[in-house]
């Protein structure tokens, strides 16, 4: 009788129009109900029936009404849906295709699905990994959620899943770009390449490295200063800005480095063969020579030139480090000529490191965690590789080369691709001073730490403190590193200028800088200058690559450490973040991140306080943990679905003594 009654519908609409409305974000719970979060302090309850119209993360407008003496929100209008393109797993329901999103808050949702035109639904099985697109939403078109599957990523039980799924999730390629049959050198007709094949350059890389993009040569002169030559692989000899391959390189931005594998920015036949500075092979290169004083000061005699070079020795980090640190190496005995070059390079690197420690900023040594995989993509071991003498030798050479490029590009063009860092966020400078100089007895003032010199001096002072507590606190007040086409300083490195050109096989920005440096050599206008958007593009690529690297690592850690809770394996954890729910630690044995909830420190909310602002955990108002502390832990839970680790300190905090009431 009342069905489709226009008067009733009109009355209902009028009532709804008079009810208050709020815009907010949906927060789902595991129990079916949810909340509309309007801001950090305001939220409204959403009953299970209303939650069926939306999903976690949706931004909606909801009407607020009172039901059973409680204010509730009923989502009415979709502002922005949380899911668009997403990764999920196939779930068969009564023989019909469904997709479960691979998202911690959405894993209980099974969404009806179809395959896009050209895909055979019969080829999909339970648990397969797919790319889905949410094409229907209840708040948009009065129908249930509906998904179109555009791509199958891999089978349910494929061990390659962590890599392929993560790359698909971030919309990144999972293979190298296609090469061409006949690469030709396309140098400017006026570019002269100096024959330097007689100069005994050496490459120092990892044992398995194929894309060797830098070769080094140093000679100590009679005054004790170092004449350094850096030769860098030259892919822009083969690729012009108008080539299709240049567009591909720009779209990729960087070679993607994931645990156990990489996805090159350029085709492997170029990166690993034609451009790679392979021992005994003549290669085109872009070179820089500079004199560095015995005190580590970079001279004004910086020169860039094009050359043909030949690596005279392919060396490995560990072998060179063993030889430098102990005087011998079982696996490698250098000729007198190569030994002299390596020794001079090492002495140069020590002079530069000493200069940077006094005048700039040297980052603390932390291990590089490396996953060793079997042919079946199982983790065989996780190695903590410390940076050794040879690593530092190459690092100092590259930093020197990039300072030279920065100075040159700034002086001649006033533009280029520069790595920059602005120091502290302006609005946080007063907080930094209050933290490090509360009594006003130190040299650090709001004015001084706003300068590059003052920022670097503060970082050097922090590195000498007994604990890393202040260093960890202050990191939150820093800006992020950026890529810019303007010559801006790099506060975090303590340098006036920094422009990378030493990895053009792996970084598109370095290719641009190569073209500009060649223009300088030719005394012509550059064939390519960095536009205003290139910095943001490269930063976005870098962000997605970092997320992908972390996600693959988290997945592999969860697989590898699955038995650790049962075995009660002991780990050493370093606290790197504290919030009101608990603290986050890095396991020093393998690099995995784990969360320690407050309840696993002590199961009494009244006694514990986790203070994110101060970076401390207190029990009974006494600080027991702070940022930078190292503690012994066991893993309490390894969640394979969320790829997350929960840890628990082995330290047990005593119960409060029970005070017995005395009878009068």
From Swiss-Prot:
<dbReference type="Pfam" id="PF08206">
    <property type="entry name" value="OB_RNB"/>
</dbReference>
<dbReference type="Pfam" id="PF00575">
    <property type="entry name" value="S1"/>
</dbReference>
<keyword id="KW-0540">Nuclease</keyword>
<dbReference type="GO" id="GO:0006402">
    <property type="term" value="P:mRNA catabolic process"/>
</dbReference>
<feature type="domain" description="S1 motif">
    <location>
        <begin position="568"/>
        <end position="650"/>
    </location>
</feature>
<comment type="function">
    <text>Involved in mRNA degradation. Hydrolyzes single-stranded polyribonucleotides processively in the 3' to 5' direction.</text>
</comment>
<dbReference type="InterPro" id="IPR012340">
    <property type="entry name" value="NA-bd_OB-fold"/>
</dbReference>
<dbReference type="GO" id="GO:0005829">
    <property type="term" value="C:cytosol"/>
</dbReference>
<keyword id="KW-0269">Exonuclease</keyword>
<keyword id="KW-0963">Cytoplasm</keyword>
<dbReference type="GO" id="GO:0003723">
    <property type="term" value="F:RNA binding"/>
</dbReference>
<dbReference type="InterPro" id="IPR011804">
    <property type="entry name" value="RNase_II"/>
</dbReference>
<dbReference type="InterPro" id="IPR001900">
    <property type="entry name" value="RNase_II/R"/>
</dbReference>
<dbReference type="InterPro" id="IPR050180">
    <property type="entry name" value="RNR_Ribonuclease"/>
</dbReference>
<dbReference type="Pfam" id="PF00773">
    <property type="entry name" value="RNB"/>
</dbReference>
<protein>
    <recommendedName>
        <fullName>Exoribonuclease 2</fullName>
        <ecNumber>3.1.13.1</ecNumber>
    </recommendedName>
</protein>
<dbReference type="InterPro" id="IPR013223">
    <property type="entry name" value="RNase_B_OB_dom"/>
</dbReference>
<keyword id="KW-0378">Hydrolase</keyword>
<comment type="similarity">
    <text>Belongs to the RNR ribonuclease family. RNase II subfamily.</text>
</comment>
<dbReference type="InterPro" id="IPR004476">
    <property type="entry name" value="RNase_II/RNase_R"/>
</dbReference>
<dbReference type="InterPro" id="IPR022966">
    <property type="entry name" value="RNase_II/R_CS"/>
</dbReference>
<dbReference type="InterPro" id="IPR003029">
    <property type="entry name" value="S1_domain"/>
</dbReference>
<feature type="domain" description="RNB">
    <location>
        <begin position="193"/>
        <end position="521"/>
    </location>
</feature>
<dbReference type="InterPro" id="IPR011129">
    <property type="entry name" value="CSD"/>
</dbReference>
<dbReference type="GO" id="GO:0008859">
    <property type="term" value="F:exoribonuclease II activity"/>
</dbReference>
<keyword id="KW-0694">RNA-binding</keyword>
């Amino acid at each position: 009788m009342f069905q489709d009654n226009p008067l009733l519908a009109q009355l209902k609409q009028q009532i709804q129009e008079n009810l208050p409305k709020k815009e907010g974000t949906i927060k789902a719970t595991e129990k079916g109900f949810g909340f509309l979060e309007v801001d950090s302090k305001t939220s409204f309850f959403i009953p299970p029936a209303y939650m069926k119209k939306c999903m976690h993360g949706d931004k909606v407008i909801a009407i607020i009404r009172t039901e059973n003496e409680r204010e509730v929100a009923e989502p009415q209008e979709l502002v922005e849906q949380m899911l668009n393109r997403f990764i999920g797993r196939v779930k068969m329901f009564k023989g019909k295709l469904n997709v479960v999103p691979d998202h911690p808050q959405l894993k209980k949702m099974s969404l009806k699905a179809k395959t896009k035109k050209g895909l055979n639904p019969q080829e999909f099985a339970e648990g397969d990994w797919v790319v889905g697109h949410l094409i229907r939403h209840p708040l948009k078109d009065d129908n249930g959620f509906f998904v179109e599957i555009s791509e199958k990523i891999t089978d349910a039980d494929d061990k390659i899943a962590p890599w392929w799924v993560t790359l698909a999730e971030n919309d990144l390629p999972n293979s190298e770009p296609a090469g061409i049959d006949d690469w030709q050198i396309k140098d400017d007709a006026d570019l002269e390449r100096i024959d330097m094949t007689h100069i005994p350059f050496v490459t120092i890389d990892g044992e398995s490295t194929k894309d060797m993009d830098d070769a080094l040569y140093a000679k100590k002169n009679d005054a004790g200063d170092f004449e350094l030559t850096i030769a860098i692989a030259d892919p822009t000899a083969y690729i012009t800005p108008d080539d299709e391959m240049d567009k591909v390189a720009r779209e990729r931005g960087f070679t993607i480095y994931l645990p156990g594998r990489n996805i090159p920015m350029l085709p492997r036949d170029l990166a690993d063969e034609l451009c790679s500075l392979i021992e005994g092979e003549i290669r085109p290169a872009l070179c820089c020579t500079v004199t560095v004083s015995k005190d580590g000061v970079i001279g004004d005699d910086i020169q860039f030139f094009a050359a043909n070079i030949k690596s005279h020795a392919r060396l490995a980090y560990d072998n060179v480090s063993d030889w430098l640190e102990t005087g011998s190496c079982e696996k490698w005995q250098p000729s007198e000529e190569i030994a002299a070059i390596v020794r001079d390079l090492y002495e140069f690197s020590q002079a530069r490191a000493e200069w940077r420690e006094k005048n700039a900023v040297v980052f603390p040594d932390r291990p590089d965690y490396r996953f060793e995989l079997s042919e079946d993509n199982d983790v065989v071991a996780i190695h903590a590789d410390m940076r050794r003498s040879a690593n530092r030798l190459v690092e100092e050479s590259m930093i020197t080369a990039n300072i030279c490029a920065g100075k040159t590009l700034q002086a001649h063009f006033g533009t280029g691709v520069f790595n920059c860092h602005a120091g502290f966020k302006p609005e946080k400078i007063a907080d930094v001073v209050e933290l490090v100089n509360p009594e006003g007895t130190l040299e650090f003032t709001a004015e001084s730490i706003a300068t590059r010199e003052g920022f670097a001096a503060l970082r050097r002072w922090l590195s000498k403190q007994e604990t890393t507590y202040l260093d960890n606190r202050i990191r939150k007040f820093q800006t992020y590193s950026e890529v810019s086409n303007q010559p801006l300083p790099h506060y975090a490195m303590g340098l006036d200028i920094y422009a990378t050109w030493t990895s053009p096989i792996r970084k598109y920005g370095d290719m641009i800088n190569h073209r500009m440096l060649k223009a300088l050599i030719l005394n012509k206008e550059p064939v390519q200058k960095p536009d205003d958007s290139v910095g943001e593009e490269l930063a976005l690529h870098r962000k997605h690559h970092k997320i992908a690297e972390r996600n693959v690592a988290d997945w592999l850690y969860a697989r590898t450490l699955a038995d650790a809770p049962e075995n009660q394996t002991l780990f050493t954890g370093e606290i790197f973040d504290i919030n009101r729910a608990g603290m986050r630690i890095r396991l020093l044995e393998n690099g995995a991140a784990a969360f320690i909830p407050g309840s696993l420190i002590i199961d009494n909310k009244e006694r514990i306080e986790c203070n994110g602002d101060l970076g401390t955990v207190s029990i009974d108002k006494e600080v027991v943990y702070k940022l930078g502390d190292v503690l012994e832990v066991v893993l309490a839970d390894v969640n394979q679905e969320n790829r997350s680790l929960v840890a628990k300190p082995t330290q047990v905090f005593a119960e409060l003594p029970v005070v017995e009431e005395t009878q009068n």
